[in-house]
Amino acid sequence: EFILPADGDCIKEGYNSDEEPDNVEIRYAVYSYAFEDNYPKAGDYDFNDIVLNVTLPAAGNDVKELKYKIDLRAVGAVKQLGAGLRIRGIDKNNVEEVNFGAGAAQRTGSLNSGIFENASYETNGNELVIPLFGDAHYIYGYTGTQRPMLNTGNASTPLTDIYTLEVNVKLKNAISVPSVTDGLDFFIAYQ
């Protein structure tokens, strides 16, 4: 929580007011990521095969914990798709732990598909890669060959409850969030 002095309470000689300072609400940035499963090959160009809304952490210096809220808004593919998050600029040696709040049970079940390791983060390489889910349809309760289009328009099955995954990354050493925010690399994968 940031606290700012009340308007007009700052003077050249410094802040010396006895008034209670104003509380400033921290606003989180929300971005949408839309994926086409055939990229870079030609596809149907609708960019609805996986649609994620992502709430990013607030900016700041010396941050030791990053919290992301990821909503799976639509699934427009009829094949198994998973999604992951690579965070460029965070060495895995600096990661104390990655844990999950809401959506953790569905995430774990969907990782049995084999697209990603069934772990908090991938063990290969030096960069932090977090599997978000291994099967978008499984997240919404579809199994086997059941792969309907979800929440993509008139001919699809509407979603009444949107799946949300909360991802918490705890670091050993503090970092600056703006550099990490620029390094986000959301991606999709399939078998």
Describe the function of each predicted region:
Residues 1-191:
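Extracellular distal adhesion/interaction modules in secreted or cell-surface proteins
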